[in-house]
Amino acid sequence: MKQTSVAPAQGKLGILVVGCGAVSTTFMTGVLMARKGLAKPVGSMTQYDKMRVGRGADARYLHYSDIVPLASLDDIVFGCWDVYPQNAYQAAMYAEVLKEKDINPVREELEQIVPMPAAFDKNYAKRLDGDNVKCSMFNVQWSMLSRWQMVEALRKDIRDFKAQKGCSRVVVLWAASTEIYVPVCEQVHYQLSDLEAAMKADDREHIAPSMCYAYAALSEGAPFIMGAPNTTVDIPAMWQLAEKTKMPIAGKDFKTGQTLVKSGFAPIIGTRCLGLSGWFSTNILGNRDGLVLDEPANFRTKEVSKLSTLETILKPDVQPDLYGHGNDEDNQYYHKVRINYYPPRNDNKEGWDNIDIFGWMGYPMQIKINFLCRDSILAAPLCLDLCLLSDLAARAGRYGIQRFLSFFLKSPMHDYTQGEEAVNNLYQQYTVLKNAIREMGGYEPDEEID
């Protein structure tokens, strides 16, 4: 490893996960099994990917951990919050993502991961009915905490966890359900002082519970990662808090299945200068995520995230002949996304894509993609990579929006107030990721294709 200014990964790394469902328990179980040598963390860039550093005779292909000081899997300590009280072993068994034989070897460790009461507002996830939630006594009745009380309780949770587990650093990862759509409000979400005032005024319309988690994490010196499409940290006020606390933030929405394919396949259409008339995407999903997304207000949040991918790759304003033909009100290609709750499939999501393209002299063609995937199996390595790389970013003194983590995310954060455009092209994202790691490792950035 070259001389680098990145602080070493000394001591334990606490990973506090919001949610103890299918994704979280698959992530935790996989890490615990991998460090016992009983499973391989396939799909994890930090554990498998190699990149070239140097050129010509000096070129070498190195793992990320040979370039920058990443935390070891052996140093990870897990904790979580959830609205359901079942420990991580019980939750993993309930989720039925992994076989019992792949859970039992780490049963004892999983049983020790007991969810702390969640900061929860049922209005933001109506399909969830757990009672392991933070509340207070008022007039002999239990009531939901105010938003500021949520923040203070969560901050205490983070401090207590860090002290009890002897962690030198903590990362907070949202792997819980999608909340209802919260439009960005300039009067509340643009200035940190306004956001704090709204929290203290218990503004439940504009302050989602996830914002309380993010505020608490950043205030306690922990990077925050948004794995759902929630508005949460995608607001200027949170960017200001991240700048103030000098903490990294990353989001939003894990790029696992259909959007991963879309961000990788759309550039093929674009680089070949083929035209696009329409792209229809539909999914069936039966886990708790699918249940929550069956609620229209929650699906709207996901829809906005999934629809944002194509428009920055296949641009109607740049190539009107190719991408300005469609039948929607914006006179561009037709793009629709649907998710259908189908319990028999559980976590085994299936996605269908119908892509109507046209070529020479406008003659039409079609592409069909059918992806039968396992949602949590694809999400788990993203959780690991995002946590390790966010921790790395913090030790490297990188704070605010971590654009180099866009590779892992469906709707990458960007400063839309300044007209910045998100990068959704998978291959461009991969280049940005590799160059950020090269730079943190003391190597020159490199635009050449490996």
Locate predicted features.
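Short glycine/serine/threonine/alanine-rich loop segments
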Residues: 221-222, 247, 273-274
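Glycine-rich, aromatic-lined ligand/substrate-binding cores of catalytic
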Residues: 305-312, 316-401
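Metallocofactor- and cofactor-centric catalytic cores in central/energy metabolism, strongly enriched
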Residues: 1-138, 142-228, 232-244, 260-264, ...
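Glycine-rich beta-alpha junction loops
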Residues: 22, 83-85, 256-257, 280-286, ...
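Conserved anion/nucleotide-ligand pocket segment
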Residues: 250-252, 256-327
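Short flexible/disordered coil segments
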Residues: 230-245, 284-295, 312-321, 342-349, ...
